[in-house]
């Protein structure tokens, strides 16, 4: 599906699929749970899902003769960390706009984790007061203008690389990769669980799995707390991406499965249930999930298993998208483990 698109390699290649046997047994043993470890996909600044997306964005950045990658996210954005790492790798400058998406209680929140890594990577880091939104950000547009004004050649990468024209392609590739691994495993996954915020990871998976009719088996767990806007953005990105890859079938609104029950109390703030899911996964599998994204999707998957959402015998693939560095910004929350 992606043969005609230029790709700049930023990842090691195939990411491993690991059975979460102890977690599955703890939850009753009626389903099998696996994780695809996108958190282990690269040596670039701890890796993560954004690199898979950026592989299809960076060729255009290089071709445009840009000298500065400019992007936006929250203070503990995984995406901005990844863009900073990629800029260092390809020899470009980097300007990161960090908006105040999360009302945090930890005094070192803006000095540890992802933002610390971005500073170490040499990015110009800018903190602004604008609040959370998944759309095009005014602060980011201002930064692009300022780079031009000082003689630079900026390349615009939106939040999560999601509404970039090629933002959905990487996770079409994820689905293709899973299909190849399923042949090796000797079975196909019945459901795929993924965290959804800016939407292109979910959208790309939806398009990729639509090739074999499994688009509604991609279960998005909303972590944005703006589900209507997020669902609309997933559908928009998916339809655009389907056109790019010539899927050959129309995607319906109902193809976007987005569960809204796990983003509470708001973006970037973990509920008690999310914290417990993070602890449970860590203590049963040694797998670290973060309070912003993966902790919420892990909580969602655990709750769905416990409620019987997945039929007995189902094989579930949890997409671990990375993000563990953000947990450093929640030291007070997890001060006692």
Swiss-Prot record:
Its cofactor is pyridoxal 5'-phosphate. Pfam families: PALP. Keywords: Hydrolase, Pyridoxal phosphate. The keyword Hydrolase applies. Its EC number is 3.5.99.7. Catalyzes a cyclopropane ring-opening reaction, the irreversible conversion of 1-aminocyclopropane-1-carboxylate (ACC) to ammonia and alpha-ketobutyrate. Allows growth on ACC as a nitrogen source. This is 1-aminocyclopropane-1-carboxylate deaminase.
């Amino acid at each position: 599906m992606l043969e005609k698109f230029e790709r700049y390699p930023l990842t090691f290649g195939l990411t491993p699929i690991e059975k979460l046997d102890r977690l599955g047994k703890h939850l009753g043993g009626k389903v099998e749970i696996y994780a695809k470890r996108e958190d282990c996909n690269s040596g670039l600044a701890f890796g993560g899902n954004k690199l898979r997306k950026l592989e299809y964005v960076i060729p255009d950045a290089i071709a445009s003769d840009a000298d500065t990658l400019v992007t936006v996210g929250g203070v503990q954005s995984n995406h901005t960390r990844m863009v900073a790492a990629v800029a260092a790798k390809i020899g470009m400058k980097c300007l990161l706009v960090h908006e105040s998406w999360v009302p945090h209680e930890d005094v070192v929140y803006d000095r540890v984790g992802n933002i610390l890594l971005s500073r170490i990577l040499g990015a110009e880091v800018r903190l602004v007061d604008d609040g959370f939104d998944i759309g095009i950000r005014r602060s980011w547009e201002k930064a692009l203008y300022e780079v031009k004004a000082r003689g630079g050649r900026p390349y615009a990468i939106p939040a999560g690389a999601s509404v970039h024209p090629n933002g959905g392609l990487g996770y079409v590739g994820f689905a293709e990769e899973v299909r190849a691994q399923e042949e090796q495993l000797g079975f196909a996954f019945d459901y795929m669980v993924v965290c959804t915020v800016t939407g292109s990871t979910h959208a790309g998976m939806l398009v990729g799995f639509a090739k074999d009719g499994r688009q509604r088996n991609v279960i998005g767990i909303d972590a944005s707390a703006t589900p209507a806007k997020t669902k609309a953005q997933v559908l928009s990105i998916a339809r655009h991406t389907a056109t790019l890859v010539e899927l050959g079938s129309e995607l319906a609104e109902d193809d976007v499965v987005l569960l809204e029950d796990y983003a509470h109390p708001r973006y970037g703030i973990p509920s008690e249930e999310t914290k417990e899911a993070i602890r449970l996964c860590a203590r049963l599998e040694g797998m670290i999930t973060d309070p912003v994204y993966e902790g919420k999707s892990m909580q969602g998957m655990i709750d769905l298993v416990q409620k019987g959402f997945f039929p007995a015998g189902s094989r579930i693939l949890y997409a671990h998208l990375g993000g563990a560095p953000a947990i450093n910004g929640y030291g007070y929350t997890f001060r006692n483990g």
